[in-house]
Amino acid sequence: MNYKRNFSIIAHIDHGKSTLSDRIIQLCGGLTEREMASQVLDSMDLERERGITIKAQSVTLYYQAQDGNTYQLNFIDTPGHVDFSYEVSRSLAACEGALLVVDAAQGVEAQTLANCYTALEMNLEVVPVLNKIDLPASDPDRIAEEIEDIVGIDATDAVRCSAKTGIGIADVLERLVRDIPAPKGDPKGTLQALIIDSWFDNYLGVVSLIRLKNGTLRKGDKVKVMSTGQIYNVERLGIFTPKRFDTDILNCGEVGWLVCAIKDILGAPVGDTLTLSRHPAEKPLPGFKKVKPQVYAGLFPISSDDYESFRDALAKLSLNDASLFFEPENSGALGFGFRCGFLGLLHMEIVQERLEREYHLDLITTAPTVVYEVKTVKKEILYVDSPSKLPALSEIEELREPIAECHILLPQEYLGNVMTLCVAKRGVQVNMVYHGHQVALTYHIPMAEVVLDFFDRLKSTSRGYASLDYNFKRFQASDMVRVDILLNTERVDALALITHRDNAASRGRELVEKMKDFIPRQQFDIAIQAAIGHHIIARATVKQLRKNVLAKCYGGDVSRKKKLLQKQKEGKKRMKRVGNVELPQDAFLAILHIGKESK
């Protein structure tokens, strides 16, 4: 037990966490030179393309320290993006310590801070590491002061390294072995294993990543899932080196994977505890706090035949991504699909892309919305995640929107631009603190404004230097309205949106004008209207196609022409009464993209 170390790396995006993990794996001989690909732990194609870590990965390595002992290092990689903070908290729950990696040129960023506080709350030992010291712009002394000033941990003897060139990697490992405590636990006690992550393998069924807190686990043991009471036989056990490597036993304090031939996708939920069926533990381990999705959107398969495979794909994906929420939804315009909850827009994009790539589905997404709290006239409280579920205006006493507390860290020279952006997003300043060259801003901004494009706009106004961390603060009464889109007085449920009354007219007008370009002309006029309740705020008309019924009349009496025109007019009237306006698929897609561009 004394020669085991469980740790993870916390860092902001692009501070060199994946490169550092590559070097550590290389130094400990986890992979041969030939097998060593850069960013070896970012195994998903998407991760490599975007250059971000999405899923937490784990590796077991052996390191011969200078004191002559060989240490077993169980290392869990974590994502750095704000949308995947839940993955980080899960990884940290399995560790005793964390390496806080900070770019020696850029300094501390908001996300690093948030993840570092999560680690300190869990009583983990945090070891600061200054990376990228080979860059000409690096200033390790200033950044060390910044870490002490902003994060509040002692960084006077922070390890300095360059993951790219390999300088100082051995020092990082020595410090890790020295400062991070060995795991606590009773090897002879009853088995308690925490499920950190699960994924679905077509051949093996559910594969779970586990951390043994107490006891040992052997191949052939019968284990019980404590939340469901189900009993399974352990068929395979092992560790990642980062390749999957089979072993016969997992000891106390180790991190490994296990296969129990669980075919039911919900058989072993993440955050659950496994114990032996013959000597069950008295109580489960404290799991993870459930995360609430912040953004909701409808996902619909383009072909209705794909509905079943879409449902299976979502179930398999939610096993691997515990923060994804979904429930069936039926839309008059788009048919059957699912209402899905995500942690943010990047999370939504990644999920949609994974569904399309890994499960070969073609999907349509409706515009994303946040959850609103509604107080009805009958004093009931409802939570609404879709505009179509919002009660009529006459039944609503108060509509409250979610407010996010945003912590923004940025260099002083961009302060003016960022404050202007926050005000434009209906933000209220709460706090402002200067740390040397950096400024820490705290704003309360409506969640709907934050999740849509605030992150991108913040990056562009500050040339990429500002960083953001946000969390849900409270619901606050606000003058929000639902804007409905009507086609020939018929409401189209999938196009409704909830917005602030001040922006309603402009958003409605914009949407109506854009739709006019995408709806094909019919034999009768099509009125496209945007309405709040019964009040029409914008309108556009798609003009009718008209057949020339007088073409066959050569001269002749005017009453004959009038009769033909009158007949055509009545026909058009009848057609308009019974005619349906079909919305083409690309009109939907275009409308949703327009919403994103214009905000």
From Swiss-Prot:
<keyword id="KW-0342">GTP-binding</keyword>
<dbReference type="GO" id="GO:0003746">
    <property type="term" value="F:translation elongation factor activity"/>
</dbReference>
<dbReference type="InterPro" id="IPR035654">
    <property type="entry name" value="LepA_IV"/>
</dbReference>
<feature type="domain" description="tr-type G">
    <location>
        <begin position="2"/>
        <end position="184"/>
    </location>
</feature>
<keyword id="KW-0378">Hydrolase</keyword>
<dbReference type="InterPro" id="IPR038363">
    <property type="entry name" value="LepA_C_sf"/>
</dbReference>
<dbReference type="InterPro" id="IPR000640">
    <property type="entry name" value="EFG_V-like"/>
</dbReference>
<dbReference type="GO" id="GO:0005525">
    <property type="term" value="F:GTP binding"/>
</dbReference>
<dbReference type="InterPro" id="IPR006297">
    <property type="entry name" value="EF-4"/>
</dbReference>
<dbReference type="Pfam" id="PF03144">
    <property type="entry name" value="GTP_EFTU_D2"/>
</dbReference>
<dbReference type="InterPro" id="IPR027417">
    <property type="entry name" value="P-loop_NTPase"/>
</dbReference>
<dbReference type="Pfam" id="PF00009">
    <property type="entry name" value="GTP_EFTU"/>
</dbReference>
<comment type="function">
    <text>Required for accurate and efficient protein synthesis under certain stress conditions. May act as a fidelity factor of the translation reaction, by catalyzing a one-codon backward translocation of tRNAs on improperly translocated ribosomes. Back-translocation proceeds from a post-translocation (POST) complex to a pre-translocation (PRE) complex, thus giving elongation factor G a second chance to translocate the tRNAs correctly. Binds to ribosomes in a GTP-dependent manner.</text>
</comment>
<dbReference type="GO" id="GO:0043022">
    <property type="term" value="F:ribosome binding"/>
</dbReference>
<dbReference type="GO" id="GO:0003924">
    <property type="term" value="F:GTPase activity"/>
</dbReference>
<dbReference type="InterPro" id="IPR005225">
    <property type="entry name" value="Small_GTP-bd"/>
</dbReference>
<dbReference type="Pfam" id="PF00679">
    <property type="entry name" value="EFG_C"/>
</dbReference>
<dbReference type="Pfam" id="PF06421">
    <property type="entry name" value="LepA_C"/>
</dbReference>
<keyword id="KW-0648">Protein biosynthesis</keyword>
<dbReference type="InterPro" id="IPR004161">
    <property type="entry name" value="EFTu-like_2"/>
</dbReference>
<keyword id="KW-0472">Membrane</keyword>
<dbReference type="InterPro" id="IPR035647">
    <property type="entry name" value="EFG_III/V"/>
</dbReference>
<dbReference type="GO" id="GO:0045727">
    <property type="term" value="P:positive regulation of translation"/>
</dbReference>
<dbReference type="GO" id="GO:0097216">
    <property type="term" value="F:guanosine tetraphosphate binding"/>
</dbReference>
<dbReference type="InterPro" id="IPR013842">
    <property type="entry name" value="LepA_CTD"/>
</dbReference>
<keyword id="KW-0547">Nucleotide-binding</keyword>
<keyword id="KW-1003">Cell membrane</keyword>
<feature type="binding site">
    <location>
        <begin position="14"/>
        <end position="19"/>
    </location>
    <ligand>
        <name>GTP</name>
    </ligand>
</feature>
<dbReference type="InterPro" id="IPR031157">
    <property type="entry name" value="G_TR_CS"/>
</dbReference>
<dbReference type="InterPro" id="IPR000795">
    <property type="entry name" value="T_Tr_GTP-bd_dom"/>
</dbReference>
<comment type="similarity">
    <text>Belongs to the TRAFAC class translation factor GTPase superfamily. Classic translation factor GTPase family. LepA subfamily.</text>
</comment>
<feature type="binding site">
    <location>
        <begin position="131"/>
        <end position="134"/>
    </location>
    <ligand>
        <name>GTP</name>
    </ligand>
</feature>
<dbReference type="GO" id="GO:0005886">
    <property type="term" value="C:plasma membrane"/>
</dbReference>
<protein>
    <recommendedName>
        <fullName>Elongation factor 4</fullName>
        <ecNumber>3.6.5.n1</ecNumber>
    </recommendedName>
</protein>
